[in-house]
Amino acid sequence: MSAEGYKYRALYPYKKEREEDIDLRVGDTLSVSRATLLALGCFAEGMEARPEQIGWLNGCNENTGQRGDFPGTYVEYLGRKRISPPTPKPRPPRPLPVAPGAARGEAEAQAFTLPDLAEQFSPPDIGPPVLIKLIEAIEKKGLESATLYRSQSSSSLTELRQILECDAASVDFEQFDIAILSDALKRYFLDLPHPVIPALMYSEMLSAARESISSDEYVQLLRKIIRCANVPQQYWLTLQYLLKHFFQLCQSSSKNLLSAKSLAEIFSPLLFRIQVSSSDSSEFSTQILEVLIASEWNEKQAAPALPPKPSKSTAVTNNGTNHVMSLQDAEWYWGDISREEVNEKLRDTTDGTFLVRDASTIMHGDYTLTLRKGGNNKLIKIFHRDGKYGFSDPLTFNSVVELITHYRNESLAQYNPKLDVKLLYPVSRFQQDQVVKEDSIDAVGKKLREYNVQFEEKNQEYDRLYEDYTRTSQEIQMKRTAIEAFNETIKIFEEQCQTQEKYSKEYIEKFRREGNEKEIQRLLHNYEKLKSRISEIVDSKRRLEEDLKKQTAENREIDKRMNSIKPDLIQLRKTRDQYLMWLTQKGVRQKKLNEWMGNENTEDQYSVVEEEDLPHQDERTWNVGNINRNQAENLLRGKRDGTFLVRESSKAGCFACSVMAEGEVKHCVINKTHTGFGFAEPYNLYSSLKELVLHYQYTSLVQHNDSLNVTLAHPVYAQQRR
C-alpha cells in the first residue's frame, strides 16, 4: 500500500549527530510521508514546500537506504511522491543547525542573544517583563488550545526576535495569534546567553536522579538544588514562574492535551540546553522537569474551586469587633516563623487546628495558612493583590482577618472539596503551654541551668554538623568540576590518539620501506605512552567518582542529622526561654539569672551597679526620638559593642533599637502590642521601653537574632550625662 509523500534533495552535506539521524551528501534524494509531517503537530497545507520552517524531518535517504531525522534547512523541495508510510512518532523540539550557505543576515540572527536573566529584572519582580507578558497573553488566548506549543507559526526568526526586543510595557501582546506567541516564548529561552537551568544545577540534579530515594525526598532535593545552587536568584525565580504557567496548562489538560510529561518533552531541551551524549541523558533532563511540573501540580491541584464572595455580615462575630481587629493583634498570626516551628506547634493536634505566618516567598503581603486535616499539615497560600486577599482568584476579602473569620464559620470545602473542615482551633501565641512545673524559684533556676546546658550542647553539635556540611558541599562541587575537567582531558587525549593512529600507519610503512627502524620504534613508543597516559587519567577519574559517591552519601547523612536535631533544638530553646520568662516575671534579678545561665559580664562597667543607679534609668541617655537609620549609625559609629539607642521606627506605632555588635551598627524593631513592648512574640510583655531596656541590659539579644550576641550595655549618651 502506498501513501502520499514528498520528495527533497540535499543541498549540503550533513554528518549525523545522534543515533536517530541520517547522513546527507550533496544531491541525495530523500522522501518523507505526509503522515510523518502531520505527526509533528506543526504541519499546515503548503508547508511541505518550505522544509526550513518545518524543522527536523523524518524520512528515507533513497541513495543510502538510511531512515531517520535530517534538518529541513539542508534540503530543497522537489515535489510530491507516492511512498510507503512509516510509523510516525512524536519527538521533542530540537534546534536546527545553521545551513552552511545561509545568508549573512541569517548568520547574524543566529548570533543574537538576549541580556542575561540577572540583567532583565531584579526582586521583588517575579520574572522577566517580556516573559511575563508573553505568558499572560498565552494564558488569556490559548490556555485551551489543542495545538499550543506543538504548532509552528509562519513568522520568521527575525520577526520573533523583534517581539522579544520590544519594550514589554508598551506592546499589546494580545495582538499576536497564539502560534506566534508560543514560538516567541520558545525562542526566548533559546536566545538567553545561559540556560534557565545551568549546567551547575543540572549536574547536581543528575546525581540526585541516580540516587535511590523516595519520590518526596527527590522533589525536596531538587527544590533545594534549585535554590541553593551558586547562580543568581533570577534563574530560579524565572523557573518558578514558568512552573506556575505549566500548572495552569495542566489544569486545562482535558482541552489542550498538555500533561506534565508532554510539557517536559517540549521544554526540557529549551531550559537545560545540554549537549547530550546519549539518549539516557536526554531522558534524565526530561524526567527532572516532569518531576518539577508534577510536584507543582500536586501541591496546587487541591485548590481548584474559587471561594465565594463573602457577605458583609461574615466579617462580624458576636462581639462585633473582629472586623476591625488588626492582623498584628490576631492570636493565630505568628509572623515570620519557620516551617519547622509551625510543625512543632501543630504536632499531635486535632483537625481544624490552624495558624497563619508570613509566606516564605519574596512577595510582600503574602501569607501561609497551615491547617491540620487528616493528621497532616495542609499549607494554603494566602495571596494579596490590589488590596484584596484570598486563596485563589478572584481575591475578594479586604483583609487576612476577614478571610480567616469567614472560614471559621464556613467550611473550606467552598474553596477545596477535599478540605471539608472549618478553622476551629487557633494556635494562640498569647496562651502558650505552661511547661514550668516546679513551684519554687530555686528549683526553677536549677531546671533552667539544666535546659540551658542541654541547649548549648545540642547547639554546638548542630554548629559542628553545619561546618561539616558546608565543607563537604564545597569539596563535592570541586570534585564534580575536577571530573568535568578529566572528561575534557580524556577527550583531547583520545582525539590525539586517533590522529596519531591514523597517520602512524602511513609513516610506519614509509619508514619500513626506508629501513628506518629507529623512527618506527619512536612512533610506536609515543603511541603506547599516549595510551598509557589515557589509562592513568581514566583510573584517576574513576577513583575520584568513587570518592565523590561516598562523600555525597556522607553529605546527605549530615543533612539528615541536622534536620533531625533541628526540632530538638527548637524545643529546648522554647522550654529554656519559658523557664527564663517565668523567673523574670517573678522578679528575679538578672545577675542571678546570669549565674544559672552561665553568662559572665566581666567587661560590663555597670555589672556591680545597683539597678536604680544605672544610667539606663534616665531615658534621655538612650531615647533619641525621631531620627532616621543613617543618623543613628552616625551616632553609634566607632563606639564599643553594646552601645545602643532607641528611636522611633518608620513602621507606624513601633520603635527601633540600634546597637553596636561585632563592630557594626545593627537595627531591630521593637513591637508595641496590647500585651506590651518586645522584640518578638511571646516576649512582648514589657510595660514600657525603660523596662525593656533594663531587662536587656543583662540579657543578650542573641535569643532573637543569632547575629546579635550583645546586651544593651552602654546608652549612647551615658558618659556625657554622668
From Swiss-Prot:
Residues 332-427, 622-716 form the SH2 domain. Residues 112-300 form the Rho-GAP domain. GO terms for molecular function: 1-phosphatidylinositol-3-kinase regulator activity; ErbB-3 class receptor binding; insulin receptor binding; insulin receptor substrate binding; insulin-like growth factor receptor binding; phosphatidylinositol 3-kinase regulator activity. PROSITE patterns: RHOGAP (PS50238), SH2 (PS50001), SH3 (PS50002). It comes from Xenopus laevis (African clawed frog). The keyword ATP-binding does not apply. SUPFAM superfamilies: GTPase activation domain, GAP (SSF48350), SH2 domain (SSF55550), SH3-domain (SSF50044). The record marks 150 as: Arginine finger. Belongs to the PI3K p85 subunit family. One of its GO terms (cellular component) is phosphatidylinositol 3-kinase complex, class IA. This is Phosphatidylinositol 3-kinase regulatory subunit alpha. Residues 85-98 have a biased composition (Pro residues).
